[in-house]
């Protein structure tokens, strides 16, 4: 039989399974592909193939991640599943696998466990917009009351991390039953109910072109007779010739007008997210703009120097530091296209941070950077990456 090609005519969404070790994340991932394969929306991927996820290196960090894809009647999904807890931490902090939403898997017999909490906290810190819960292994619990208690506990836990615990859909079932094709009421039916909840509850992410215009500046040229050209890859939005933009970061914010957009030496009327362009800007001298700043739609983003962040510190094996760092550590923070020196404030009660740790840090930069919550960065020492982080809260 010829392999059916996925038609990309449905909206696309990136999701993943999160939760405590052995609560059934990988079994659930396999079960989703099995149930949807029967409906023509996936290729079945068995447990073993998801579990032996290949190692990938993302910005020098070793992460094992399995990727499967499938579709429901409404959407096309790319789904990530990680074999180990450390892989989740790294994945969520580096944004190696962007998640527009996640399925939190909780074993009904155990209830929430330490990594359940940690994954919910990480999801909150790195800005995963929505969670749906799958209460797994319900056939191992005889007492309906216990299921109700576990559900209550999960909802309270979600609320304590600022997720809408009362509203989040919780689907009960057995991923193994679905995978083995038995007990449809807790097997296949629960998978269909879960996917319906994911379709309905996880919001469709805005396309990059629908967001406000932002382009990190990579290079600046002066073209005689024409003026100053800045080059870079448009991160989000659309820029049309004649529109006003702000130049933000490192120095005081300046306003200018884009008088020309060119790509591959051709003049265009507009550039959009993903395009590598040169933008001709009016009335700005070459020395007034530099790499590390951004061009952005006026009012859409502001420069900041102080923030807190969720950070993963590379282990020695990953080429990171061999020794811990302490309070007043001053590395470089690499945002988009440039390094800015910053000072680290450790959380209350933390004396030092070891290679391989993940930690919440407060940072004070010596120069402002255009940032929003959710912005990713690398921590570097003399050009070598020693950590990866995401802005979780802007303080100044």
Curated annotation (Swiss-Prot):
GO CC annotation: cytosol
Domain of life: Bacteria
tr-type G domain span: 10-207
Record keywords, A-Z: Cytoplasm, Elongation factor, GTP-binding, Hydrolase, Magnesium, Metal-binding, Nucleotide-binding, Protein biosynthesis
Amino acids binding Mg(2+): 26
Region: G5, residue numbers: 174-176
Broad enzyme group: hydrolase
Reactions listed under catalytic activity: GTP + H2O = GDP + phosphate + H(+)
Primary location class: cytoplasm
GO MF, one annotated term: GTPase activity
Chain spans, region G2: 60-64
Self-association and partners: Monomer.
Family of this protein: Belongs to the TRAFAC class translation factor GTPase superfamily. Classic translation factor GTPase family. EF-Tu/EF-1A subfamily.
UniProt-listed PANTHER family: ELONGATION FACTOR TU, MITOCHONDRIAL, ELONGATION FACTOR TU-RELATED
Protein name according to UniProt: Elongation factor Tu
Gene name of the record: tuf
């Amino acid at each position: 039989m010829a392999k059916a090609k996925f038609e990309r005519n449905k909206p696309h969404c990136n999701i993943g399974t999160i939760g405590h070790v052995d609560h059934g994340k990988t079994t659930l991932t396999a079960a989703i592909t099995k149930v949807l394969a029967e409906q023509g929306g996936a290729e079945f991927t068995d447990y073993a193939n998801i579990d032996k996820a290949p190692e990938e290196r993302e910005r020098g960090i070793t992460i094992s991640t399995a990727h499967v894809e499938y579709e429901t009647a409404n959407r096309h999904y790319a789904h990530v599943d990680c074999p180990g807890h450390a892989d989740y931490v790294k994945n969520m902090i580096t944004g190696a696998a962007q998640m527009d939403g996640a399925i939190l898997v909780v074993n009904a017999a155990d209830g929430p466990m330490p990594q359940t909490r940690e994954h919910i906290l990480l999801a909150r810190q790195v800005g995963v917009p929505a969670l749906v819960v799958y209460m797994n292994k319900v056939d191992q619990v005889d007492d309906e009351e216990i299921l109700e208690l576990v559900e209550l506990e999960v909802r309270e836990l979600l609320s304590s991390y600022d997720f809408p615990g009362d509203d989040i859909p919780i689907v009960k079932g057995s991923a193994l039953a679905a995978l083995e094709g038995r007990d449809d009421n807790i097997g296949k039916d629960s998978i269909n109910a879960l996917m319906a909840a994911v379709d309905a509850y996880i919001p469709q992410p805005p396309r990059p072109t629908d967001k406000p215009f932002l382009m990190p500046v990579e290079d600046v040229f002066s073209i005689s007779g024409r003026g100053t050209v800045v080059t870079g890859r448009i991160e989000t939005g659309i820029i049309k010739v004649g529109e006003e933009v702000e130049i933000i970061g490192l120095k005081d914010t300046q306003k200018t007008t884009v008088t020309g957009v060119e790509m591959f030496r051709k003049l265009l009327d507009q550039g959009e997210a993903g395009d590598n362009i040169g933008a001709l800007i009016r009335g700005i001298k070459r020395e007034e703009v530099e790499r590390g700043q951004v061009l952005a739609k006026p009012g859409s983003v502001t420069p900041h120097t102080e923030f807190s962040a969720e950070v993963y510190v590379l282990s020695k094996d990953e080429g990171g530091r061999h020794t811990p760092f302490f309070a007043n550590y001053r590395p470089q923070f690499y945002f988009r296209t440039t390094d800015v020196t910053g000072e680290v404030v450790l959380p209350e009660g933390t004396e030092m941070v070891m290679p391989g740790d993940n930690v919440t840090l407060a940072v004070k930069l010596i120069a402002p950077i255009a940032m929003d919550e959710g912005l990713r960065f690398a921590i570097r020492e003399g050009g070598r990456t020693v950590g990866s982080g995401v802005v979780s809260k802007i303080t100044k």
